[in-house]
Amino acid sequence: MVTSSRKKTEQLTLLALLTALVAVLAYFGGFIKIGGLASISLTLIPVVIGAALCGPYAGAWLGGVSGAVFFLTADAAFWFGLSIPGTVITVLLKGILAGLCGGLVYRLLEQKNRYVAVITAAIVCPVVNTGIFLVGCVIFFLDTVRDFAAAEGISVFAYLILFFVGLNFVFELLTNILLSPTILRVLNIRKKNN
């Protein structure tokens, strides 16, 4: 039987490792481009793992770390140029809420079916992340988005979907869905060891 103190130490260690992984992926993920149009982001995978293994607050923490590290990347300069408060609020809120919601969904479904719980959490994370990003774009950056959309001759909605969401969301969603069985395996191995 694992003692309460040991279990807390293991969780803290796991959270520290996942925090480091999120930081590295958040920083270097922006340098991996898909056809020059979108940046690949793998940070939501350890966010889902942390949210499932350590709880919703750990997921929120990991999402917040991802957002905070983004501020150190070259991509952040564009958004800061539009609105510093808007960028800070949008980026931190989308990461924190993605991790929190993923953890809450996992916790809600875990007792019924762990496989469904992890896949659902892996879907919820990028949906919330992208949804909050779009809301932030409308609230804080709408004038700029309108100008960009007009220059392309398309609607604001089409511009948001094509240029700001586009392949990045599809990649994040598919990556999370495809790696869910791996995440589930990690969960099962950890459960057997406890």
Regions found by a protein language model. Give the residues of each.
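Alpha-helical transmembrane segments and their cytosolic interface
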Residues: M1-T19, L108, I139, E152-N194
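Hydrophobic transmembrane alpha-helices
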Residues: M1-W61
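Helix-boundary and loop/linker segments of multi-pass membrane transporters
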Residues: K7-K8, G36-A38, A76-G81, E110-K112, ...
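Hydrophobic alpha-helical transmembrane segments
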Residues: L12-L17, I45, G59-G64, V88-L93, ...
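Alpha-helical transmembrane segments of multipass membrane proteins
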Residues: V22, A26, L62, S66, ...
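Interfacial aromatic-anchored transmembrane helix boundaries in multi-pass membrane proteins
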Residues: A26-S39, V65-L100
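Internal alpha-helical transmembrane segments of multi-pass membrane proteins
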Residues: L108-G131
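Juxtamembrane non-transmembrane "cap" segments at the membrane-aqueous interface
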Residues: V128-E152
